[in-house]
Regions:
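Residues forming the flavin
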Residues: 1-50, 56-265
Length: 265
């Protein structure tokens, strides 16, 4: 696939115009093109008349020809979709993996594990969203703080009560997969294209719930109000974690505890 960047058009322009300009910029005949699509879209309002700025994805019928067209176009680059496959290890797990924390990292880790048949156990120190929202509202109204159910802790993590902007500066190609998963669980479909994707807090709560439901549907288990309290190591390897006064045997654990769980640190 080729990405053609910096396709600038008036606000009134439609996607087909962006595709045509991208092919013209790339100097590739339409007859060689298998598919065109919008990879990213933003608005540049910095200088005078605002412009739409597209990044257009172009797939040729003969992928082997793509490098030659890219070489003569400074605004073009080759792009391959990141592999979002969870690769199995060489040794079978005796016990289910444990994911500690149900914020963004824990949600996606548990979702991938569940989709691949690992039946993860998720430990979340806070409550499910409905109870968490009630606790936050109570705090706002009365000042009564539940240390495990608040803006920081609970299903969805701290970002659940932000304004829903999805911001990253890492440029990781896996970001596209993350946006697609969010859209598949109820986020606006256009976040996969927008340069500044925005879900919105009201929608984000529903997205988080739907992701949790898929985890459970695929054999995962979510234990709310169950903080990680300890780990057990034998012969240099993890053998169990402690939570809710019991040992949970496991060989693998994902510590997705965020930055505010000081007692866990």
């Amino acid at each position: 696939m080729i990405l053609v960047r910096n396709i600038r058009l008036p606000l009134s322009a439609a996607e087909p115009q962006a595709f045509e300009k991208a092919l013209h910029t790339l100097r590739v005949p339409r007859s060689k093109v298998e598919h065109t699509g919008v990879a990213k879209l933003s608005v540049d309002a910095r200088h005078g008349q605002p412009k739409l700025v597209y990044t257009v994805a172009v797939t040729l019928k003969q992928p082997g020809e793509e490098a030659a067209f890219v070489a003569r176009c400074p605004d073009a680059a080759l792009h391959s979709r990141a592999d979002f496959t969870l690769h199995a290890g060489t040794q079978p797990l005796v016990h289910r993996p444990v994911v500690c924390g149900l914020g963004p990292a824990g949600l996606f880790a548990a979702l991938l594990l569940a989709r691949n048949g690992y039946h993860p156990i998720v430990l979340e120190r806070g409550p499910a969203l409905a109870d968490r929202v009630a606790a936050v509202q109570k705090f706002e109204q009365t000042g009564a703080l539940d240390p495990n159910a608040n803006i920081q802790f609970g299903e969805g993590g701290a970002g659940t009560f932000s304004d829903g902007k999805l911001t990253t500066r890492i440029g990781d190609p896996l970001c596209d997969n993350v946006l697609e998963i969010l859209a598949a669980h109820g986020a606006p479909a256009d976040i996969v294209k927008k340069a500044k994707p925005h879900v919105g807090t009201d929608i984000l709560k529903d997205v988080v719930r739907e992701m949790r439901r898929e985890i459970i549907k695929n054999g995962g288990e979510v234990r709310f109000r169950t903080p990680l309290t300890g780990v057990s190591v034998k012969n240099g390897a993890l053998c169990a974690v402690q939570a809710d006064g019991q040992d949970i045997a496991c060989e693998r654990a994902v510590l997705a505890i965020g930055h505010s769980a000081r007692d866990t640190f």
